[in-house]
Amino acid sequence: ITASRENEGSYETVLKYKIDDEETTEKTIKSGEIFTKEEAVREAKRCFKCRCRDCIKPCVHLQRFNIAPKSYIRNINHNERIIQGTHYANKMILSCTECGLCGVMCDYDVDMKDVVKETKISMVERKKMPQSAHDFALKDMKFSNSEKFFTYRKEPEKENIKYVFYPGCQLPASSPDYIEKIYKYLTDNINEGIGLMLGCCGAPADWSGQNELMKETAALIKNAWVELGKPTFILACSSCMSNFKKYMEEINFISLWEVMDEYELPKLNASQSLKLNIHDPCTSRNTNMQDSIRNIVAKINCEVHELKYSKEFTKCCGYGGLVYFANREQSNDFIDDRIMESNEDLLVYCTMCKDLFTSRGKRTFHMLDLLFSDDLEKSALQKMPTLSERQHNRMHVRNNLLKNIWGEEVMYEDEKYNIKINDNATAKMEEMYIVLSDVKKSVENSIENKERFFNPSDNSYLTRLRIENVTYWVQYEVNEEGITVTNVYSHRMEVVEANNEDIR
């Protein structure tokens, strides 16, 4: 009678159920020897629906897909085993920011960050990763580690250096004016020699499961580090710290915020009478920089109110895991969820956190705004640069630093044609992840090789150009002032031309 019926009736489970958010009611008192029907119903309603959802409550990703880790892992397993057919779980997998909050919340050490990471690596190795999901982010990383941005130098007139400042790729892209100010601050306060290195740590490769590309990026950084004399890195980005820890263990590093906490702060240019909620980037989880930031804020007399989910329990802004590129709707869910938790202006110390929060209209300060900005009001709603502007800003930072600090002459690319982009085309470029340099290449090719269609009804030209794995279509007009691009489009299909004999 009792065979295979161990878990029926009353028994002790492994479930650890927290009742902090539950409403409790008084025990129902029996009016007689046994409960009446009404009393029994009332007493039964006091029972909690005991399901462990601690990881789901703070995660808009698990909420959007209405799934718990156990089912998530089962779906991933099924997705991995499909040889032919539709991989239905791809979108879900690529919508995880890999922030690790679910692992922190879980009493059973189930961390979807690790599961999703391994799954992405497997998808890449089996050639099942959708190319479009992370393509632009990887190309942007390639740009940042090209000669247009990647640079390293020792401090002028110093043979040996103890430190090298590495701002990452997003801070120069969004706040280019701060990089030289930070470097000057560091050289003014530290006498042991401070070098500079510009580039990308490889976070896009890590987040997209591109293991080989990540190894190449780590090797690029390590080779430059050896040439500089193996200095300690001063990192301004928490994602850089995470990547250095995972892939470059032999390199010593410290966060910029720990350095600033130790030394005297810059003289402030703007008044500080702010009430702020601090948002910790998810890659700062379990690091010393969280305390350093709070120490710095206390020194400049800002009033800080902690968010419900902060420090070890902080949430992702919506950029992690490259979700911003793979699933923009899910990314917006993360952004809006974090904004709704905040009653004050936000204070962040991650560039992408600031860019994403301000993109949804939330007043947000970067820690560097409080230390170096001349206009805090303007900084609070600073518009997120376009993808093309981000690359331009990186080149601008590199060229200015080489000229102003190292006295090197920098060669600028000549503009062959006066090309302007109207508002419609600019919006389409952002939507489709098209950068200005590719639009210019398309226009230049059409003019020089006469590869274009002419539309006499509106005097416009239409051209296409295949660059790497994307075909770009550009519509433009020619007038006395130059060339105006009016529309753009891109796709991954390759347009193959055939001669008349092939057609027959």
Region locations from a protein language model:
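A short, charged/proline- and glycine-enriched loop
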Residues: E38, K158-Y166, A270-L276
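Redox cofactor-anchoring modules in respiratory/redox and cofactor-processing assemblies
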Residues: A40, Y263-V410
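Short beta-strand scaffold positions
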Residues: I234-L235, L347-V348, K420
